[in-house]
Amino acid sequence: MADNSIYSTLELPAAPRVQDDSRWKVKAVLHRPCVSYLVMVALGLLTVILMSLLLYQRTLCCGSKGFMCSQCSRCPNLWMRNGSHCYYFSMEKRDWNSSLKFCADKGSHLLTFPDNQGVNLFQEYVGEDFYWIGLRDIDGWRWEDGPALSLSILSNSVVQKCGTIHRCGLHASSCEVALQWICEKVLP
């Protein structure tokens, strides 16, 4: 019987060669300094940005004095700054004399408007609440720092000898009434 076998030559691809890892190690070593360099550049930029922000903040705080300013004048905690003045709006209520003493103890005084400027701004801010201010009736309405009141004040009783500010303007009140108050401090 004849042998019907078919033979074929099988050509298999050669086994993959193991690549030399040393080439990859060299590239990895070369990339490490680049990463370190990028980190250094990023940290340097961050430092420059932060220093610029500090300089900008100091310039805002000290005005045109820049670094000549030995210490920026700041308002105490819980006080609001407007220009060269700090203002404290109390949350608690006291009579006029206790409010006056509170402000004096903080190196300030009850809010005054000796030149009648700023009344409208504060009227808008205080809204419906009444706040003690540095105004009282002793032989006529006078501000605590001396000048006579040249604005009108609403009063409905002769016993109302202390001034308040309200959304609707200046009002007289009995000095014994417990109200909130506004202290004012001029920055050096």
UniProtKB/Swiss-Prot annotation:
Glycosylation sites: 82, 97
Residues on Extracellular side: 56-188
Residue ranges annotated as motif ITIM motif: 5-10
Main location per the UniProt record: membrane
Regions crossing the membrane: 35-55
SUPFAM superfamilies: C-type lectin-like (SSF56436)
Protein known as: Killer cell lectin-like receptor subfamily G member 1
GO CC field: intracellular membrane-bounded organelle; plasma membrane
Subunit record text: Forms a monomer and homodimer; disulfide-linked. Interacts (via ITIM motif) with PTPN11 and INPP5D.
Tissue spec. comment: Expressed in lung mast cells.
Entry-linked InterPro entries: C-type_lectin-like, C-type_lectin-like/link_sf, CTDL_fold, KLRG1, NKR-like_CTLD
Modified how: Phosphorylated in response to monoclonal antibody G63 binding and antigenic stimulation.
Stated role: Plays an inhibitory role on natural killer (NK) cells and T-cell functions upon binding to their non-MHC ligands. May mediate missing self recognition by binding to a highly conserved site on classical cadherins, enabling it to monitor expression of E-cadherin/CDH1, N-cadherin/CDH2 and R-cadherin/CDH4 on target cells.
Species name: Rattus norvegicus
Gene3D superfamilies tied to this protein: Mannose-Binding Protein A, subunit A
Organism superkingdom: Eukaryota
Gene Ontology MF, one: carbohydrate binding
Comment block on domains: Contains 1 copy of a cytoplasmic motif that is referred to as the immunoreceptor tyrosine-based inhibitor motif (ITIM). This motif is involved in modulation of cellular responses. Upon phosphorylation of ITIM motif KLRG1 associates with the two phosphatases, PTPN11 and INPP5D.
Positions of disulphide bridges: 75-86, 103-183, 162-175
SMART domains the record matches: CLECT
Membrane topology: Single-pass type II membrane protein
Pfam families: Lectin_C
Matches recorded under PROSITE patterns: C_TYPE_LECTIN_2 (PS50041)
